Amino acid sequence: MSQILSASSRLKPVNLHGADSETCTMVFKNHWNQVQRILESHDPFKNTQAKYRSISADEVSAVQNYVEHMLMLLIEEEVTDAAMGPILEYVVSENIMEKLFLWSLRREFTDETKYEQLKMYELLVTQSHQPLLHHKPILKPLMMLLSACSGTSTAVVETKLAVLLNQLCSILAKDPSILELFFHTSEDQGAANFLIFSLLIPFIHREGTVGQQARDALLFIMSLSAENNVVAKHIVEGTFFCPVLATGLSGLYSSLPTKLDDKGEDWHCLLKEDCLQIPELIQFQNSLEFCNAVIQVAHPLIRAQLVDYIFNGFLLPVVAPALHKVTVEEVMTTTAYLDLFLRSVSEPTLLKIFLRFILIHQHEKVHILDTLVSRINTPFRLCVVSLALFRTLIGLHCEDVMLQLILRYLIPCNHVMVTQRSAVREQDCYSACAEKFLSLTPECCALTVSSTGYLERRQTMYSKFRQRTDSDDSKHLYEKDTLMDGDCAEPVDDNYLEYLWEAHENILNCLEDCKVWSAPYDGQNPDPEISLKALMEDNCRRGEFPTFRRATRHYMDSFSSETPSLGGKTLLDLEWDDSYDTGMSPDSGSCSPQPSIDAVLPPEPPHHIQEMKRNAIMFIKGSYIEESDFQDDVMVYRLCAVKDAKDADMQNITDKNDIETNDQFTKPQEGNQTQANYNKNANLNEDTVKTQVKQTLPKVKIQLSPAADDISNMNTLSPDSEEFIARYDDMLNGLKTSTLEDVISPIHSLASPMEEDEDEFDKYSLDLPQAESIPSPFGPRDATIFSNFLPRPQTAPFTGPFISVVLSKLENMLENSLHVNLLLIGIITQLATYPQPLIRSFLLNTNIVFQPSVRSLYQVLASVKQKIEQLAATQQNFPVLLVEAQRYLLCRMDMPNQSADTFTKDNIAANTERKPAAAAAEAPRGVVQKAKEHRANPLLPLSGESKHIQNAMLAAALFPEFLKELAALAQEHSVLHSFHH
Amino acid sequence: MNPFWNMSSAAVRKRSDNDEKIATGDQKISPPRSSSAKKQLPSIPKNAVPITKPISPSPSVQPTNGTHASYGPFYLEYSLLAEFTLVVKQKLPGVYVQPSYRSALMWFGVIFIRHGLYQDGVFKFTVYIPDNYPDGECPRLVFDVPVFHPLVDPVSGELDVKRAFTKWRRNHNHIWQVLMYARRIFYKIDTTSPLNPEAAVLYEKDVQLFKSKVVDSVKLCNSHLFDQPKIEDPYAIIFSPWNPVLHDDARERMLAQKKSEEQSKGLHVSGLSWVKPGSVLPFSKEENSLQT
């Protein structure tokens, strides 16, 4: 080692500028002669004694000294024209470098020797005044050295190797003409291979500077490959670059912690500072970012291969199972990781496979998207983490995301009254919708706190507007200026201008991003009729009916919200995975005119879902509950049978169905086990039973043959069969209320023994209002009346699981914790920013008339308003508590925005400067953490008796702000629409 | 008080006579659709409608609380902004408007007449919008120089807008229609119940004399083109003679901007979409970049 150190210290450039070229060459040749003498004395070909003589230390150091000096001379040699300098020419013609390499091989080829040699080449390559790598006598020994180093394991050598490789690659990047040489020097040893590249691959996932150097070096080559088909082809066909990169991700992922430390109550996504605390995560992120960078610069062939490997080698085998782990905790962690990855990836090609994975991949026959949506409805932290993931997804402004999440349910326009179709495109010329949103402000919330920062903020807003006016030609902006000159803003308007400003910016951003979308989504394009067909075919292929789910779910949603729930009851909303049990699983497609085998025999809910449910229940109750506690499902089957029998009578379909129902009654196994499975955990109430009843409905129609569970049956009834639809409608119409009551009333009597049966689970479910709220399980009958206007199959209008779960969650605003509400508000305002008339009209047009079974945002907000007013009427010192809550929120707002780095992408990061509702939605994190740190801070603590009241008060304080945001968005849409084409 | 509100009332001169007797061309401009379309919907079954949602929105919702009322200026402002965007969208040939700096209720405009009797006429005008828009009367349009025309008041220069919009109906009538009407009177001359009887009579009886009077009027208007604007306002429309130093450059920039916009189209891709046009399925777009 001392040798190495001395070597590097002595190799300081000597000032040779004084010496003339001729002298230098003389000195060089002289030195070489000295060296050569020593070399030859040990060369077995030239000296027969050589093999018996050992190399003395003196000889070694003599050679070393000469060589060092020679290298200095070579490095310092300068030439004016393109020709080689005399020293270089001598080096090349005498093949000096190769001879030196062989000499070092002849000695013991230790790590120290390797280090020396690597160092020597590094100096040559980086310091030399003339290009050296073009010359094979220099390149070849270098290659030999590199390949000799490939198996090495010493950290010192590895570091040096990485540095040299990095240097070589950067030279390559600057001078691609050398590439050819690099490629073919090794041809002598066999197949063409790209040695520097292969040597770099093992370092890809290395941590620390070595890994960084190697990755940088690889990026040089990647950008080279973009221009060079040969290199690209070689990398794709001749190296394991892509597989190593992708499977490396899997390896690194598996070392990530499966559970995260408790990060505080309102933690919902991984921020930069979270990542920094987990070294494994840093390493993973490095590799992911490297993949991103490779995809950014590499040749399309490499890009395609890498993306393919990441999909098939990382997402499918690793992330998918991780998303379906057994414990809520693990699933939550995976969701948070996935969210982080989505935010870290910026290359569209890479993002695309992540989105493809989330949007259309199925795990155990269930779409990952559906699973993720259903998790919003859990009472755990998993809910907020899932919401955060969706916030990220929606913030991408990606057409495919919006299509799967929302638009596919809106395109058929089933959600609007037929006469209102054209209203989808209508603009709200006179701010009528904004007015309606604002009119939902509960009177009890009208008073506002004046905060100290308020005046300043207003000032900055004003100046911002003014600046904008000067610089921007958009015609209308100065009018805002006018408005402000008027100083007409009363206290209540204080931040409304900010909301308008932000809405303006956000809509413009979104408009810009949506320019690449394939269609305007205005209710005409894509054509509702044609698209409906395409979507139905797709659904068929997917084996489910997401477009036409039952309306019942909406009623369930409204039930839970209509529950007067502020009476201090336990409010554990254990609506676990409703969507799985009712709305989302394929068997719920019973409203669909498309019969399928799935409608007959619901598939087993995926194993992990059942597992999770069980876990969830344990979690909630803090103790394990025997599964058998939920096994009493015979009753349900009896009900199904009764119902089936009734239906059978109605339809005059006799024997076969009897057999079928008997079958079902007596042999509740296999497929029926599923029903058992979801009933055992579901709240056993009318809804569930209705679900059952409803699910049995299609059987009457479909099970024309006992072999109904035969797949082939699927084809016997065409989805578009007019006759089938007609009969289906008839049947629906035939089921008047009386029939329903007949069906439902026995449920009560049957259900009562169940309640006595120590079904503890019931205690955790919500008390549902009994008589008044029993809706027709088939959706309002009138829907079928309207259906007569439709030239196509009428289906229960359904705006999709996502909308429905988000709105139902929103309706429970007063029971939600602050961060759930902030996320919900964030998501809804993000959605309301989209300029597509279908989305805009659904969320913001308060005048449009929807189908009765469709619940609109306005209706949900109206219900929240009502609840707030109820609260105000019953809650003592409501005004005091409200002011406190407002102060609390203002405090959060004034805190420095710690999570500006939450979003790594520009389009989202642009929105960091925000105000009350939105600001908190983005940056809820730091605030409560700070609140914990400074418990003494007199402003922060809320004095509500319970967490429950505190949440309600915070929601009440947020609500008016949310309304302002929506109103502002509605107003800006009316002005900005013309920019959208 | 807010000048936003005062401005218009100060600027608008009251007109005493309303020509309500005149039948209008209203119908052609905006075919009367039933304004109560929403009410004619099939009645929604009671059990399906949440209590909170009003079944039919009443046209003039009275603000129920104080909070609500203070947003009035915003609603008016945005209504006018929306109107303005509609005007921009219409791209009426030869018609240009610009809201004033001081009030969104006052718009400056100019009409270029490119053929017909009034060919080469450049008529500046001002539009005054009532402050209870859109529930008030129709906007007024006053030419800076009274044009010789049967429907233009020879003294005040005001155009008879009312005959086209007997009653201003929100959602059906828009300001761009007023502007379109103002343009049309120069191409299709109507002489019934004129504000300028002389012009009307001449047009009926002696077209030649009418024509020459029109030519004089156009000349007069054009001679006042470079006058200072009648109403002093930073956004008033001002004409000045062509100044190569100033205008050549500006003109070039305007043309260049248009070109560069066209060029940059398609190059700048910031959004995300893998949906094939015409498809409603995600990731339906073929990846053609791979086959390079």
From Swiss-Prot, chain B:
Family: Belongs to the ubiquitin-conjugating enzyme family. FTS subfamily.
Chain segments annotated as transmembrane: none
Protein name (database record): AKT-interacting protein
Keywords: Apoptosis, Cell membrane, Cytoplasm, Membrane, Protein transport, Transport
CC per GO annotation: FHF complex; plasma membrane
Pfam families: UQ_con
Membrane topology type: Peripheral membrane protein
Top-level taxonomic group: Eukaryota
Location of region: Disordered: 1-64, 273-292
Gene name of the record: aktip
The UBC core domain, residue ranges: 75-223
Biased composition (Basic and acidic residues): 14-23
